[in-house]
Amino acid sequence: MAAAAEGVPATRREEQPPRDDAAVETAEEAKEPAEADINELCRDMFSKMATYLTGELTATSEDYKLLENMNKLTSLKYLEMKDIAINISRNLKDLNQKYAELQPYLDQINMIEEQVAALEQAAYKLDAYSKKLEAKYKKLEKR
């Protein structure tokens, strides 16, 4: 290294940082595997890739089956809810019909209640008038 440094001008030598030989890695020459090894590795790779893809497809298929089952259950639940809604609607129509049938009687009850209130007011007025008459009668009787 010292011999190589002598051929380089002094300013050039100062610019280069000192090298740490412990940090330098050595590379080995890449050797191609034998043809039989490549064929075996390819077969192994394709086998594992087939296994992987089969697993992925199986998982996807299972997901679709799960979604199908969930859709069927949801459909059944909505059919049940539809039946419940139909029953509620039918019962509500029956109640409305019964209320319509009772409406004349309810109107009569309201009219009777108004008449009773008017009669009660008349009774109070009559009572007040009779007390006035009684007071006048007693007053006239004393004379």
Curated annotation (Swiss-Prot):
Modified residues (N-acetylalanine): A2
UniProt name for this protein: Biogenesis of lysosome-related organelles complex 1 subunit 2
Function according to Swiss-Prot or TrEMBL: Component of the BLOC-1 complex, a complex that is required for normal biogenesis of lysosome-related organelles (LRO), such as platelet dense granules and melanosomes. In concert with the AP-3 complex, the BLOC-1 complex is required to target membrane protein cargos into vesicles assembled at cell bodies for delivery into neurites and nerve terminals. The BLOC-1 complex, in association with SNARE proteins, is also proposed to be involved in neurite extension. As part of the BORC complex may play a role in lysosomes movement and localization at the cell periphery.
Subcellular location(s) per record: Cytoplasm, Cytoskeleton, Microtubule organizing center, Centrosome; Lysosome membrane
Entry's transmembrane regions: none
Source superkingdom: Eukaryota
Organism: Mus musculus (Mouse)
Self-association state and partner proteins as the record states: Component of the biogenesis of lysosome-related organelles complex 1 (BLOC-1) composed of BLOC1S1, BLOC1S2, BLOC1S3, BLOC1S4, BLOC1S5, BLOC1S6, DTNBP1/BLOC1S7 and SNAPIN/BLOC1S8. Octamer composed of one copy each BLOC1S1, BLOC1S2, BLOC1S3, BLOC1S4, BLOC1S5, BLOC1S6, DTNBP1/BLOC1S7 and SNAPIN/BLOC1S8. Interacts directly with BLOC1S1, BLOC1S3, BLOC1S4, BLOC1S5 and SNAPIN. The BLOC-1 complex associates with the AP-3 protein complex and membrane protein cargos. Component of the BLOC-one-related complex (BORC) which is composed of BLOC1S1, BLOC1S2, BORCS5, BORCS6, BORCS7, BORCS8, KXD1 and SNAPIN.
Family as reported in the entry's similarity comment: Belongs to the BLOC1S2 family.
Keyword annotations of the record: Acetylation, Coiled coil, Cytoplasm, Cytoskeleton, Lysosome, Membrane
One Pfam family named in its UniProt record: BLOC1_2
